[in-house]
């Protein structure tokens, strides 16, 4: 869930930044990217917990559900409620970098000759940006998005520990502490399979995103 929101918002913000490079939005968000990436991620997570749990008690400090657990539809809503703070924390840390990378990729693409030709034909700037620029810049952006999804499936050890979330990263750590070799092998095999499947998916989808790759393959 976090990875999907992160990729969508990051790409949209990056496209907006690329549309007006050097603008107030571009400069302010670029500075924010440097500030956030200069902070330890676990420290920012602890700050959010201190603020949203103890100063303004809006969310629980961690865990996947309340004790005792509710029943029925209330159980689903309770799980979503416990997911809000971890997802919000990860989102605030990672989507800035996603937007910055998208911005740099698209800005480079907008300098190409075919973009200037599209503008010379009188196409609307939005169509030039999303219809031509984004399509040409799609392969690296899609790669970035798929790798983000794969990393989210693998788990994030530090955040799962801070928020006491029972994910794959936390399971890795418990298996290492207990020297549980079968669990470690199972997790490693699952992670390897997921990554290989993701890379195979990227190879297939590249042919649809960039016709030059498809033609080169046929030759």
Per-region residue spans from a language model:
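Alpha-helical transmembrane segments of integral membrane proteins
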Residues: 1-25, 41, 70-219
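Membrane-water interface segments at the C-terminal ends of transmembrane alpha-helices
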Residues: 31-62, 82, 89-95
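Peri-membrane helix termini and adjoining interfacial loops of integral membrane proteins
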Residues: 54-68, 160-166
């Amino acid at each position: 869930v976090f990875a999907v929101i992160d990729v969508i918002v990051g790409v949209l913000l990056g496209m907006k930044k690329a549309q007006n490079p050097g603008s107030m939005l571009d400069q302010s968000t670029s500075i924010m990217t440097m500030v956030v990436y200069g902070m330890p991620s676990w420290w920012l997570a602890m700050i959010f917990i201190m603020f949203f749990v103890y100063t303004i008690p809006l969310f629980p400090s961690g865990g996947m559900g309340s004790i005792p657990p509710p029943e029925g539809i209330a159980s689903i809503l309770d799980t979503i409620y416990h997911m809000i703070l971890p997802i919000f924390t990860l989102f605030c840390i990672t989507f800035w970098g996603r937007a910055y990378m998208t911005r740099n990729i698209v800005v480079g693409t907008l300098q190409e000759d075919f973009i200037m030709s599209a503008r010379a034909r009188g196409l609307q700037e939005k169509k030039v940006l999303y219809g031509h620029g984004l399509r040409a810049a799609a392969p690296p952006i899609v790669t970035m998005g798929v790798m983000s999804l794969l990393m989210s499936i693998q788990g994030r050890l530090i955040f799962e520990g801070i928020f006491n979330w029972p994910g794959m990263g936390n399971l890795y750590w418990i298996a290492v502490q207990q020297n549980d070799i079968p669990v470690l092998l199972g997790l490693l095999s699952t992670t390897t399979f997921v990554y290989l499947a993701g890379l195979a998916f990227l190879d297939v989808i590249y042919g649809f995103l960039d016709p030059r790759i498809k033609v080169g393959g046929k030759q």
